C-alpha cells in the first residue's frame, strides 16, 4: 500500500485526539487538580551521602597524618657553622668552656703562633675570642 516516497498522514481521529490532549490538561492545571509528577529524593540523598563520605575521609586523613603534621623535624648541627669573614679569623676548633676557662682567671701565656703584636698590644688568642 505504501509507495516509495509517499507517506500517509494519520487519520483525523488520531490527529484530533493528540491536539485536544493539551487543551484538556490546561483547565486541570488552572483549577489545581493537576498533580506534579512525583520526584524521588535520589539526587538529594546522593549529595548528602557524598558530603558525609568526604567528611569521613577528611577526618581519617587528619587523625592518621595529624600528629606528623604538628611535629617539626629539625636537625641541628653539633657545632655552629664556620663563619667565613673576609680577612678574618676562621674558628674551626670548638670546645665547651668550663669554669676553669673564665677570662678573668686565665693566666697570661705565650702568644698564639701566627699572631703578631698589634700596635695597641698583642692580639687575643682564639680561646679568648671564643669567650668574648
From Swiss-Prot:
Q: Which InterPro entries match?
A: SMIM33
Subcellular location per UniProt equals: Membrane
Q: How does it sit in the membrane?
A: Single-pass membrane protein
Q: Does the keyword Ion transport apply?
A: no
Q: Where is this region: Disordered?
A: 1-28, 99-132
Q: Which domain of life is it from?
A: Eukaryota
Location, primary (coarse class) = membrane
Q: Where do transmembrane segments lie in this chain?
A: 43-63
> Which residues are sugar-modified?
15
Q: Name one GO cellular component term.
A: membrane
Instruction: Keywords in alphabetical order, please.
Output: Glycoprotein, Membrane, Transmembrane, Transmembrane helix
Q: What is this protein called?
A: Small integral membrane protein 33
Q: Which organism is it from?
A: Homo sapiens (Human)
Amino acid at each position: 500500500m505504501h509507495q516509495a516516497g509517499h507517506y500517509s498522514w494519520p487519520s483525523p481521529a488520531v490527529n484530533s485526539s493528540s491536539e485536544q490532549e493539551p487543551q484538556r490538561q490546561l483547565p486541570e492545571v488552572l483549577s489545581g487538580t493537576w498533580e506534579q509528577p512525583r520526584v524521588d529524593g535520589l539526587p538529594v540523598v546522593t549529595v548528602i551521602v557524598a558530603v558525609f563520605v568526604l567528611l569521613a575521609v577528611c577526618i581519617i586523613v587528619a587523625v592518621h597524618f595529624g600528629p606528623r603534621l604538628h611535629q617539626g623535624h629539625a636537625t641541628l648541627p653539633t657545632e655552629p657553622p664556620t663563619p667565613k669573614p673576609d680577612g678574618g679569623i676562621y674558628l674551626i676548633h670548638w670546645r665547651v668552656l668550663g669554669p676553669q676557662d673564665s677570662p678573668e682567671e686565665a693566666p697570661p701565656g705565650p702568644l698564639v703562633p701566627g699572631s703578631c703584636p698589634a700596635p695597641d698590644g698583642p692580639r687575643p688568642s682564639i680561646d679568648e675570642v671564643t669567650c668574648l
